[in-house]
A protein has these predicted regions:
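Extracytoplasmic small-molecule ligand-binding "clamshell" domains
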Residues: 24-104, 256
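Ligand-binding clefts/hinges and TM-proximal coupling segments of bilobed small-molecule sensing domains
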Residues: 24-28, 156-173, 210-212, 242-265
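Short loop->beta-strand "edge-of-pocket" segments that line small-molecule binding or catalytic clefts
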Residues: 36-43, 140-154, 169
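Alpha-to-beta junction loops
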Residues: 39-40, 76-78, 84, 94-103, ...
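Acidic, polar ligand-binding/catalytic clefts
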Residues: 65, 69, 73, 78-141, ...
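Extended ligand-binding regions for polar small-molecule ligands
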Residues: 66-74, 140, 152-155, 221-261
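A ligand-binding cleft/hinge motif common to bilobed small-molecule-binding domains
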Residues: 87-88, 104-113, 160-163, 184, ...
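Periplasmic-binding protein-like
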Residues: 122-132, 195, 199-242, 260-265
Length: 265
């Protein structure tokens, strides 16, 4: 009798778990995206080598511009780009404006309180970019009174620099303005940024160079970002990131856009 009762309870539990798993899958963004045939992807269109809109063609160019198309193709759906920024992407995800953010988002502990991150695909740290002939000669010149340091508003570098700088003035720059423009117009003495943005400055703006700190600062993984509470969707995105690492698509896309040195292993 006891064995019969336990067997019955186990069977009921299995049925309940199966039903719960089935309901979870049906409610997942993975199911909804494949059913609708459209993947809405949040992207900041001002990120060099990551997701930069070409002013001549209007097309998005960069590693995530390429890889977002790969994800949509692997899912068998169309890609719909939803423009966002570092200051608004969390609210956009929470408001269900997109299923995923793909634009070099730094996976920080603070952001992880509001969204979930995939396995990392890039890893970078803080770089300083300055003008030749400016007041900054080496790293020790940065944190001094009278020095204006520009950062992108909402970037992971902004809160780090707030804690790091003791004497210099920190100026967060909100889109559509850019920290690069602040530097070149001499409103800023130096900008704090990541590898992709430092790469852009030294390639596109004559008379600029970047400085590395004596030791790496704010080493941060870049990952894809999804809303909280959808483990099925997050599992799929994680598997996809692992897949493009193994099949070479991540390395190839990074190499096309000069990001080979910061590919996550």
């Amino acid at each position: 009798m006891r064995k019969t009762l336990m067997a019955g309870l186990a069977a009921a539990l299995c049925i309940g778990l199966a039903g719960s798993a089935s309901a979870q899958q049906a409610d997942s963004r993975l199911y909804r995206v494949t059913k609708a045939g459209v993947l809405r992807m949040c992207m900041w269109p001002l990120y060099y080598s990551i997701s930069m809109r070409d002013p001549k063609t209007g097309e998005l160019v960069g590693i995530d511009a390429d890889l977002s198309k790969e994800l949509a193709r692997d899912m068998g759906v169309k890609l719909e780009v939803v423009e966002t920024s570092f200051g608004t992407f969390i609210a956009d995800l929470q408001a269900n404006k997109c299923e995923i953010g793909m634009f070099g988002v730094g996976a920080t502990m603070k952001r992880a309180q509001a969204v979930e991150f995939s396995h990392p695909y890039l890893v970078t740290n803080v770089y300083a970019v300055l003008r030749d002939g400016g007041p900054i000669k080496d790293w020790a010149d940065i944190d001094k009174k009278g020095v204006n340091v520009a950062v992108t508003l909402g970037s992971y570098i902004e809160p780090f620099m707030r804690g790091y700088l003791k004497n210099a003035t920190l100026t967060p720059v909100a889109p559509p303005a850019t920290s690069q423009a602040e530097l070149m117009s001499r409103r800023a003495d130096i900008i704090m940024t990541d590898f992709p943005s430092a790469l852009r400055m030294t390639k596109e703006f004559e008379g600029t160079k970047f400085l590395l700190p004596p030791e790496k600062l704010a080493v941060t993984p870049y990952a894809y970002v999804v809303p909280q509470g959808d483990q099925v969707w997050l599992n799929y995105v994680n598997l996809w990131v692992d897949t493009i690492k193994l099949d070479g698509r991540l390395a190839a896309a990074a190499a096309r856009h000069g990001l080979g040195p910061i590919v996550a292993q």
